[in-house]
Amino acid sequence: MPPFYIVITFLLSTVFRISQSVHHHLNEEELKQVFGVSNKHDVPEYSLIEATRHPLKNGNLKMKFTAWNDTYHLNLRKNSRIVSPHIISVVRHGDDDVTTYAGLRDYEQCHYQGEVKSHGNMKAAISDCGALMGSIVMEDHFLVLQTLPKRVHHLQKERHLVYKRSAGLLTNAESKIREEITRLQEEQESFCDTSEQLDDPAMTIPAHLHFNYTIPTSAQLDSSFIFPNMDPITLEIGLFLDSKLFEHFEREYIQDAEQHLLEFSLALINNVHVLYQQDTLTPNLDIVIVRYEMWRTQPSALSTGVHKNGQAQSLLDAFCRYQAHMNPGTDLTDMNHYDHGVLLTGYDIYHTTTSVAGVAPVARMCDPLFACSLVEGLHLGRSFVLAHEMGHNMGMVHDGVQNQCNKGCCLMSAVNGAGKTTWSDCSVREFNAFLLQLDESGRGNCLRDASPGLISTNHLSDLRLPGQRFTADQQCSYFWGRDYKVEIPNGKAMDDICRILWCGNSGSTISTAHPALEGSWCGANKWCHKGQCTHWTFGLTPVPIDGEWSEWGGAEKGCPIQQCAVSGSITVQGQHRDCVNPAPNNGGKTCEGANIRGIVCGATSSNCLGFTREEFGNKICSSIKYDPHKPDQQLTGEGFEHSTQPCRVWCHLIGSELIRNKGQFPDGTPCGFDAYCVGGQCLALSCDNKALVEQPEDCPRIEGRSVHQWEEWSSWSECSVSCGLGGREVRERKCSSGRKCQGVSEESRPCEGVLRDCEEFGEWKEWGSCSEKCALGVQKRFRPCLTDQCSSKHLQEERPCDNEGCWTNWDEWSSCSQSCGGGRRYRIRKCLDDKCDGDDLEKESCNTQKCISQSWGDWLPCSVSCGIGFQIRERLCDGELCATANKQARTCNQQQCPSAFSLSVWSEWGEWTTCSATCGEGLQSRERSCRRGSCTEDDASQTRRCVNGPCEHSYLTWSEWTTCETCSSFDSRKRIAKCDGTTENCQDKIDEETCDIACLREKHSFGPISPRRPKLITSNDLRKAFGRPLLPIESIHSEKWSEWGPCSVTCGSGRRVRTRGCQEASCPEQHIQTEECNLNSCLELFIWSDWSSCSKSCGQDGIQTRQKLCLFNNAECSSYAESRRCKDLPSCSSISSGRTISENGFDAPRWSEWSSWSACSCFSLTSTRRRFCQVVDPTVQGFCAGAILEQIPCAPGSCSPSAGGWSLWSEWSSCSKDCGDTGHQIRNRMCSEPIPSNRGAYCSGYSFDQRPCVMDNVCSDEKVDGGWTDWTAWSECTDYCRNGHRSRTRFCANPKPSQGGAQCTGSDFELNPCFDPARCHLRDGGWSTWSDWTPCSASCGFGVQTRDRSCSSPEPKGGQSCSGLAHQTSLCDLPACDHESDGEWSAWNEWSGCMGNCGIGTRTRVRACVSPPVSDGGQPCFGRSSEITECRQSPSTALCSSFITSSHLADGYFIDTDQQQ
């Protein structure tokens, strides 16, 4: 299927009748300038106006005009911000000789903003400089004011007009778009490369992660946030032109090369600006030059030694760093700061393909280093390439390759072709997503600042279209090189250049990356217009221009040093001239003669002994085939001698008869008899052996005169026939100084002597067999002689031959070119006779597994607004949180906290009072006292809601027991407690006990019991009653107590019994015991653990914690922890304590102990443990090197969620200040006891705490600023196989800052990936088969059954673990139970009070599955048992922390952060 591209065609419609007709006199450029449209049929409704202006003394302006029978009154104020006076232009001669110019001349402030007083103070922006223009924002449309071109002023008295424009992003005409698919037969080549390997850690990330932002859907593109009204999108650029480009213009323009280069570069930027002002791109982007730098000599950082042709990546890397160094300040600090650096280069940045012409980093705009692009700058068509590369830098990707748009459509297409002058919908979405990312990044969007730019240059001001300024031949020479001109391939016509400009150099035909420029002559009496070859419609038709030669150039360089590369070479100075004085255009005649010649330096005899021509060609072809940077592996490595183009190096292609031009022989290389190479052409030695020319007219002048003399006649040629009659001989002579010698230059005569009769032969016979079975042999064939005399050598022919099977065995495969993401490897074999069929090189794909891309996210905001806090960031692997080493933390210090003496200092909170209600909902309170400062009374106490268990139902007294007829345990008695009717849903209570207990109750005064009669008890009955065999009478003695029997009730206080047997005569006093059991409330679903040991051994800061443990896996119970201060601890003054100092002599941060391993995750099949970096001394910057967590594979035993629990607090750090001010102490804990697993809840509350500390000593005047220690050794690699990293740190302790000295600047932590395939024998895990389903947990009603599998077939070893669930649970399909009761939710409780920090918080409400509860196999309640919503506190009750800007609440408790000093 041939490639295709999309041509966007606008189907335009006229929506109103225009009363005025002045627009019919405007050309297309004027229509665009005035109305923003290209077609006269699309002109909007407008009115010609006469604007009256009244300047005021304060510099403001009043203006009035009438349009559509309505008068508009405007009050305007000067806007002096749109132009900066600090523009800089630079001409550089190397590093030391620099000329700098500053400022704009003759600039006046003539731009205004204001309101339309006559129309509801609608906003207006008006400019009244050389021309009046501006806009008025009405409610449902815009009014746009414009000045008419001077060319049509004579047609009417009005000089201005105003027209209406829809407020939509697209006009009605623009919204009617049709896509037409046009197929192309031409080959399309990539013209763009994106930088992926710049020498910077951030640039080693694969390209598809360079732009880690979300691309919005088209439905989101009208967001007022993405397109804010009046919010400028301006790209300020620094434009750099390298010395190679300057050399090109110095060759082309003998005089004023700098001026020509300036005009050309500004024209190119002007074209780019037009592309970014298209209606297909929203919002439009203004491009302004704030720095212009021309290098007549290359800076040392970008000298030729640093790079060479074909090294685009290294050149871009060097330039990006150079322009970043030259870029002053920031957008906020320096008005000469630019957003993006552009290098227009004269180098061929990719020598393996002439199509690739630009390269830029992806999504790095506003980056301080890599907001830059590199583009070949020899042709105006590079404006398309530069716009494309700038698009990459602003987040756009290739259409059809990395998004869903057509790959052949628009400016972000990755291939060459015509019609690519618009932006696709995908590019618009990507551009706006990148703008949104910059807006939300927190670093600022450098594109949203107003431009202080250079005055724009309109290169159409002389009314010449680009194609009239630069002919089609000049466009080819700028694009491909000096020798390239328009060359139409077979099957094409001249008018095709308007769609694709074809260029050639008498070799292979090449298509350029753009159509011919607007106004280019395309044959007959036609010119290019909008991609079509049409008649001229822009006024006077251009007249034909005949070409004339420029002067010969190159003489000023002198003769080169002789280079003996090819044997027999002579020293030649090449000279060149161009047909550009003027260039032929519009069908005019081209120059006659050659454009190149060579001046012989010295003698024509040569003693050079170098390579043969064959050896030199082979050397060039082989070096290009095996180039380490850009190899051309289609070449065989062998050269080819071309008979008609002997001065070009041609190389064979593998597996075909094709050849490819890969260079040329050096000037002076012999290419025939008395002929030598100059600039890739073979020229004859002439002009008295003084020059190499194509014709005598090109000989250099000798002292101002020409010599017109014939050279000697050549020898007679051989006869034109070898036998028979009719042959002739020829001889020639040449005019030494041109074509003005008298006489003829050629003579001929009949052949002298008698020729023999011609031989006649029969047909050739078939070729014989090859003389060798393997390797080179010979084949012969014969033919008969049909005359009397035939030479024997004419009767036989030989040719070389070989047979198949002469290959050596294949070599081993080479190493793969990539470690992941798809690479290539190859192997070779050799042919024993150099004539084998087949390829000597074989390639295949390798390492196709996906690369794991990793990137650290931004640091989260500091945890505190003042003092020492923490910041956290996460590491993403392929867009998801990495499995290991996925978090980092560091200390942060936003600003110093206010002095403790200016704050209110409170004592610790007292204990919470007992709940005011014993059941249901009540209140608790606690108090604290003011220690220092201006405390407010309202902050001295807190109240919170408390909820105890549900209130018990009210019952009447118990009834009498029923009667026991025996004392057997097989009989029982009952009693009933009736409800008193005061509560709802109350059911009668029934109490039951066995009669043996009743008898004991009577015997031991438990209560009366009725008379009983004997009952026969068999041994079987006893065995059932006591659960053991009946013993003989003689063996009955006192026995051990039996196990306790079951409790009489499951909750609400019951009793249980145990017994022991004995002989009647020796029975102890008691052989039956009872006790209470199941004392918990019937609604209790949890129990509290014991209080932990105190976190401190002395003082008042000790903390004890306990956990709430759920008794059942029920939605109504959620685990959490609570803490309290330890009591009765001794004073720390009696206990000596000291802080351990590290061997370095300072308190370095240190790792905490590892936590316990988490429960095995059913999702990742791993168990995790973690630790945290404990800050001992806040004044010592630094971090802990090594992994913050570890993971091991595991097989889960259960998939039940496990909520996390806090570890104990670490010890308080030392004070962050050592003198004279209030500092802070910090401590840490982590959610690791246990670590949450299987999607269990994370801990609520802070993982860190801080309190103020006051240093009484006064700082001395001798401040000590901090200094860095050496970097620590790299930590061990966390995983040599997957996502491995190692880290190192350094400390601000050499010396440690003291006496108010400054902290160290720079990074205190470094992280590097590590990977060692030698240590990995990677093996991905595989699931075992599922086990059988377990029996159902119930026989009726609600029951479940489970099954499981393990990641053991095989177990993972460094590779991927199994994905999916290891356990499955399913509901059983059971019949209903006889008396089952499904659970139902109770009504929601009232919302709790609002709890939060600084007026913003949350409130909760709960419900329980008790209306009714589940019983006898019924279904449980499904859904949430609690809800949380945001709320706002009234100003009178809102509480704010002094040191922390946001609070996390844990189950209604305020986290106490304002500790005592």
Curated annotation (Swiss-Prot):
Annotated Peptidase M12B domain residues: 233-435
Proregion positions: 22-163
Segments carrying motif Cysteine switch: 190-197
Biological processes per GO annotation: extracellular matrix organization; proteolysis
Binding-site positions, Zn(2+): H388, H392, H398
Localization (cell): Secreted
Annotated Pfam families: ADAMTS_CR_2, Adt-1, Pep_M12B_propep, Reprolysin, TSP_1
Catalytic site: E389
Cofactor details (free text): Binds 1 zinc ion per subunit.
Tree of life domain: Eukaryota
Any one Gene Ontology cellular component term annotated for this protein: extracellular matrix
Disulfide cross-links: C405-C410, C719-C751, C723-C758, C735-C741, C816-C846, C820-C851, C831-C836, C862-C892, C866-C897, C877-C882, C1047-C1077, C1051-C1082, C1062-C1067, C1160-C1194, C1162-C1199, C1173-C1184, C1215-C1253, C1219-C1259, C1231-C1243, C1277-C1314, C1281-C1320, C1292-C1304, C1336-C1372, C1340-C1377, C1351-C1362
Expressing tissues: In hermaphrodites, expressed in the vulva, head ganglia, ventral nerve cord and amphid neurons. Expressed in the rays of the male tail.
Primary location class: secreted
Keyword Ribonucleoprotein: no
Signal peptide location: 1-21
Entry annotated with the keyword Metal-binding: yes
Domain Disintegrin: residue ranges: 464-546
Any GO molecular function: metalloendopeptidase activity
Keywords: Disulfide bond, Glycoprotein, Hydrolase, Metal-binding, Metalloprotease, Protease, Repeat, Secreted, Signal, Zinc, Zymogen
PANTHER family, alphabetized: ADAMTS A DISINTEGRIN AND METALLOPROTEASE WITH THROMBOSPONDIN MOTIFS PROTEASE (PTHR13723), PAPILIN (PTHR13723:SF281)
Domain remarks in the Swiss-Prot or TrEMBL record: The conserved cysteine present in the cysteine-switch motif binds the catalytic zinc ion, thus inhibiting the enzyme. The dissociation of the cysteine from the zinc ion upon the activation-peptide release activates the enzyme.
Protein's name according to its UniProt entry: A disintegrin and metalloproteinase with thrombospondin motifs adt-1
Organism: Caenorhabditis elegans
